[in-house]
């Protein structure tokens, strides 16, 4: 541009010297100079505009970011406030005056129903019941998401009759007992190994080889398992994770007379044609010779010995032994394990006064429980089930059916009745009750019946079967204490 200006100056000087010859050229170049000035001014203005546009965009971005942060913070504060209001309602509900409750109902209960449903669905049975008393809306939602508590019936199995195997049910809540029914699907040598989810794991007690099968006494469906030629059932404790109709079902067996150097474990899944056998190092040789029942909880199988807790992980195929503080031993150990909401409990009925313990996982100790906080535990040789929600005389009790306990129990009832009769122990009164409470006998038998607690389907009622009338029973003339 400087060169162009010099050229124009030269032309102007030439014009002065030669005014007639260069007028047109000078005018032409003057126009070019004006155009260049206009372009320069436009360029300068455009640069400023672009700069301002960029600044404006930056301001817009900052404003949008501030707005989003404000919205996020508001929503977070609202969520925190909702949770605080919910906690206040739950904590103060039982002891709040009607006036204060009314104020809370107006201001604090305005929570989205989806949020209330989500929260109540994750509460325990006890907290769900408590939450349902807040207001009618909450009561309806709590009832819709409430997990039904387990029901337990006693299945009694008699193989000593000439007519063959018979069985029946006893509902301790309704205090009703069914009449006995024939069971041609089973042989007299059938034994019950384990009960869970309404199914029984059974075997032929006369066979040294573990001939096992699943049996559903409600549908009479039977599922045979392949022969287990390694584990003799008489020396092995068995359990299963869930109903065999589910793909996740796993049968677990552990040999309780394993050698001093190894623990033998067998597993089987529905659809498999053979068992899987594995040996694991026995880190505590003398501890796993007297095992109680096997507990399946949260994907793991647990076995309790005198001073340790054995844990088998079927996914990782690992066996671990966790030392725990020992519980005083009796000459004859009678123990069960069960679980409720992730907590593991142990019932020790080795003495005449049963004790209940809960596992403290952090400190590896069994903590003694004086009560069950409203729960109840049903115990038999093939099952141990913990329930919640029972009331009255069925709350905070241990309900036993065990041939070992029945044999040692002092009673005024005739021998055949005492050996074939369940009884409950109250943790409130620390005493046992032998009142039959509806458990009557159709006939007198000198053989010992087999009994196991079983969880019936929720769609089935004890009244779906023929109920034994007390007037037809043979033991109503005896006095039970």
Curated annotation (Swiss-Prot):
Coiled-coil positions: none
Highest taxon listed in the record's lineage: Eukaryota
Database matches in InterPro entries: F-box-like_dom_sf, F-box_dom, Gal_Oxase/kelch_b-propeller, KIB1-4_b-propeller
Sequence ranges assigned to domain F-box in this UniProt record: 105-156
The protein's name in its UniProt record: F-box protein At1g49360
Organism of derivation: Arabidopsis thaliana
């Amino acid at each position: 541009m400087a060169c162009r200006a010099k050229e124009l100056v030269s032309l102007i000087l030439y014009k002065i010297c030669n005014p007639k010859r260069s007028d047109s050229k000078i005018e032409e170049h003057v126009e070019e100079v004006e155009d260049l000035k206009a372009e320069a001014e436009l360029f300068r203005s455009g640069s400023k505009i672009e700069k301002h546009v960029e600044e404006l965009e930056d301001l817009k971005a900052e404003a949008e970011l501030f707005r989003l942060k404000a919205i996020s913070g508001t929503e977070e504060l609202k969520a925190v406030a909702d949770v605080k209001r919910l906690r206040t309602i739950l904590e103060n509900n039982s002891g709040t005056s009607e006036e204060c409750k009314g104020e809370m109902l107006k201001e604090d209960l305005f929570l989205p129903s989806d949020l209330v449903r989500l929260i109540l669905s994750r509460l325990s049975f006890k907290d769900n019941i408590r939450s349902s008393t807040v207001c009618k809306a909450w009561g309806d939602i709590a009832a819709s998401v409430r997990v039904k508590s387990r029901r337990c019936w006693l299945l009694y199995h008699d193989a000593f009759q000439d007519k063959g195997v018979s069985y029946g049910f006893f509902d301790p809540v309704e205090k009703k007992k069914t009449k006995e029914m024939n069971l041609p699907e089973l042989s007299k040598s059938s034994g019950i190994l384990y009960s869970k989810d309404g199914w029984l794991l059974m075997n032929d007690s006369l066979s040294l080889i573990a001939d096992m099968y699943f049996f559903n006494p409600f549908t009479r469906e039977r599922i045979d398992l392949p022969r287990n030629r390694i584990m003799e059932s008489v020396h092995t404790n068995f359990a299963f994770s869930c109903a065999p109709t589910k793909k996740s079902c796993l049968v677990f067996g552990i040999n309780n007379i394993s050698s001093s150097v190894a623990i033998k474990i067998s597993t089987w899944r529905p659809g498999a044609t053979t068992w899987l056998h594995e040996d694991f190092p026995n880190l505590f040789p003398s501890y796993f010779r007297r095992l109680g029942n096997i507990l399946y909880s949260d994907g793991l199988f647990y076995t309790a010995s005198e001073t340790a807790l054995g844990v088998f992980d079927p996914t990782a195929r690992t066996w671990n032994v966790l030392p725990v503080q020992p519980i005083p031993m009796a000459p004859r150990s009678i123990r069960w394990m069960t679980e409720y909401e992730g907590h593991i409990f142990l019932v020790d009925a080795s003495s005449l006064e049963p004790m209940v313990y809960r596992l403290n996982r952090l400190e590896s100790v069994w903590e003694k429980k004086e009560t069950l906080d409203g729960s109840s535990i049903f115990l038999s040789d093939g099952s141990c089930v913990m329930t919640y929600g029972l009331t009255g005389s069925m709350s905070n009790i241990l309900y036993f059916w065990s041939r070992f306990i029945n044999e040692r129990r002092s009673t005024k009832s005739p021998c055949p009745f005492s050996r074939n009769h369940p009884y409950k122990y109250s943790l409130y009164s620390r005493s046992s009750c032998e009142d039959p409470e509806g458990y009557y006998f159709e006939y007198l038998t000198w053989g010992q019946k087999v009994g196991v607690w079983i969880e019936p389907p929720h769609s089935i009622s004890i009244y779906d079967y023929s109920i034994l009338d007390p007037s037809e029973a043979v033991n109503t003339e005896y006095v039970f204490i």
